[in-house]
Amino acid sequence: MAKRNVVAKKKVVKKNIARGVVYISATFNNTNITITDEMGNVICWSTAGGLGFKGSKKSTPYAAQQAVESALSKAKEHGVKEVGIKVQGPGSGRETAIKSVGATEGVKVLWIKDITPLPHNGCRPPKRRRV
């Protein structure tokens, strides 16, 4: 019989971090949630597509809410109690994601910033859709 190659799973080390930053990237197609410590080191992340939402369902506000709840439950295991929020992008899940961070028990929101990049007349935008 041939030998099996067994790959050892990486063990998640529990960190004790009191404050974190929630980055919400809401695009037209998906919503990405990343939680970091104050230095910018990633603690955990979650996406709407990674939770099983496929196609146009990824861009819904409900999918964004589920992604936030998933990421915050992982972050609570590391001891995160206070967060700041940085929001980027024009997606539909943006407002819902902010509200669901504030509604989560055991997590206090300290501040909210919009870090969406705005061009000073940069690249030409894509042409209008004709449906």
Swiss-Prot record:
Q: Which Pfam families match?
A: Ribosomal_S11 (PF00411)
Superkingdom of the organism of origin:
Bacteria
Q: Which cellular component, as a GO term, is one annotated location?
A: ribosome
Q: Which UniProt keywords apply?
A: Ribonucleoprotein, Ribosomal protein, RNA-binding, rRNA-binding
Task: Give the GO biological process terms.
Answer: translation
- Which InterPro entries does the record associate with it? Ribosomal_uS11 (IPR001971), Ribosomal_uS11_bac-type (IPR019981), Ribosomal_uS11_CS (IPR018102), Ribosomal_uS11_sf (IPR036967)
Q: Name one GO molecular function term.
A: rRNA binding
The record describes the protein's role as: Located on the platform of the 30S subunit, it bridges several disparate RNA helices of the 16S rRNA. Forms part of the Shine-Dalgarno cleft in the 70S ribosome.
- Record-stated family: Belongs to the universal ribosomal protein uS11 family.
Q: How does it assemble?
A: Part of the 30S ribosomal subunit. Interacts with proteins S7 and S18. Binds to IF-3.
What name goes with this protein? Small ribosomal subunit protein uS11
Q: Which organism is it from?
A: Helicobacter pylori (strain P12)
